[in-house]
Amino acid sequence: MRINPTTSTSGPGVSALEKKNLGRIAQIIGPVLDVAFPPGKMPNIYNALVVKGRDTAGQEINVTCEVQQLLGNNRVRAVAMSATDGLTRGMEVIDTGAPLSVPVGGATLGRIFNVLGEPVDDLGPVDTRATSPIHRSAPAFIQLDTKLSIFETGIKVVDLLAPYRRGGKIGLFGGAGVGKTVLIMELINNIAKAHGGVSVFGGVGERTREGNDLYMEMKESGVINEENIAESKVALVYGQMNEPPGARMRVGLTALTMAEYFRDVNEQDVLLFIDNIFRFVQAGSEVSALLGRMPSAVGYQPTLSTEMGSLQERITSTKEGSITSIQAVYVPADDLTDPAPATTFAHLDATTVLSRGLAAKGIYPAVDPLDSTSTMLQPQIVGEEHYETAQRVKQTLQRYKELQDIIAILGLDELSEEDRLTVARARKIERFLSQPFFVAEVFTGSPGKYVGLAETIRGFKLILSGELDSLPEQAFYLVGNIDEATAKATNLEMENNLKK
């Protein structure tokens, strides 16, 4: 969905600079430019430079770059944020005197931006009275909110077994077609309804098709309100796979800057989605090589930990509000020891693993209850009742997993009475972990359900206690709280009696 950016004043304000600091392109190597400036007029690191002019065919050129290195001899090396086609040596370069700034605030909701904060959705210009630079330091210790609190999502399997921390970072692992997008959209919907919060989606190195699909699905499910765009619950920032590495490396910071404004100025709870955090590292690796740095382990940039840290440390809770981040993590060749995912893991508070096996069974959300983890699942944080229930649910499911081979070979009848009971309860638990989503209503026809944490715990305690052993397992499939399951069981019984 790469549409030419709508003409907007959101780029660095060139006219206001009266062109006071001009340089000229000295060398072009792919997306990297060397620019010569007059002595004593060197731009700072991270300053935005703008190249304006015409190419040999007479087409207008407008390329924004970011200063990365000061080379000496009055030269700087900058990385381009868009294609460098048509640039020639000797072209005039304007130093904007400040880092890249992007529009922030309510005007960004329901819109799609590129790395420069320019709208790319053909819906006209964006109000740019409020802008913010993409390079900022992380909040000071004194501003941080150190209280550990659960971020309730209303999704049973997440809240019970791998709860999210308010202001924490969650890794989302899953292959293609297991429901990542639907889970992301449901979280965006729930934070808006339950917490009055907003979301920012950063597509980092995304496939253009996937970005387009997400946008269309968001419009279909009402997350983006086409009639009244200001009522939308999400802002989208895309730096697709076809963009130069500079854009892919910085698009995460553009999304984060928009999220920080909602947290610090509007004092809201914000969800920040980054899909995919691995592409951020990959783009950094490309830029590092282009800048001539010596590669580190597995060819990654030597500054890998620093780059990751500078992004992740800005994602946190402050006294004003919180940014809770959900990051899709691609694991190259399924090697968890690869430096990119290994560096990411150090920052995560919880992992949500989506399982193809559960998706194949039709259990959605297909979150793997045994593989998903959270540092919040401790009795002193979530309370004894929640912790005990979660552990017993996991034990039951683990035992069922161990017995599956025996069942496959010998059948259920060969199991002991106790094991048969465990299997029956585990199958009920497995089905009760499924849930109808609000954003899937348009596809499934069944109304979505938000289940509070207390209701979730009560439901699983009842299943584990054996009080519901007499109910059929299909009564627990795709329902909200436990009362709906018992009502569904009664309906099923009545239907069966009528058939007889």
Curated annotation (Swiss-Prot):
TM helices/strands, residue ranges: none
Name of the protein: ATP synthase subunit beta, chloroplastic
GO cellular component: chloroplast thylakoid membrane; proton-transporting ATP synthase complex
Compartments, record wording: Plastid, Chloroplast thylakoid membrane
Listed Gene3D superfamilies: 2.40.10.170, Bovine Mitochondrial F1-atpase, Atp Synthase Beta Chain, Chain D, domain 3 (1.10.1140.10), P-loop containing nucleotide triphosphate hydrolases (3.40.50.300)
Membrane topology: Peripheral membrane protein
E.C. number: 7.1.2.2
InterPro entries per UniProt: AAA+_ATPase, ATP-synt_VA_C, ATP_synth_F1_bsu, ATPase_a/bsu_AS, ATPase_alpha/beta_chains, ATPase_F1/V1/A1_a/bsu_N, ATPase_F1/V1/A1_a/bsu_N_sf, ATPase_F1/V1/A1_a/bsu_nucl-bd
Keyword Transport among record annotations: yes
Gene name of the encoded protein: atpB
Homology family: Belongs to the ATPase alpha/beta chains family.
Keyword Cell membrane among UniProt keywords: no
One example GO MF annotation: ATP hydrolysis activity
Complexes and interactors: F-type ATPases have 2 components, CF(1) - the catalytic core - and CF(0) - the membrane proton channel. CF(1) has five subunits: alpha(3), beta(3), gamma(1), delta(1), epsilon(1). CF(0) has four main subunits: a(1), b(1), b'(1) and c(9-12).
SMART domains: AAA (SM00382)
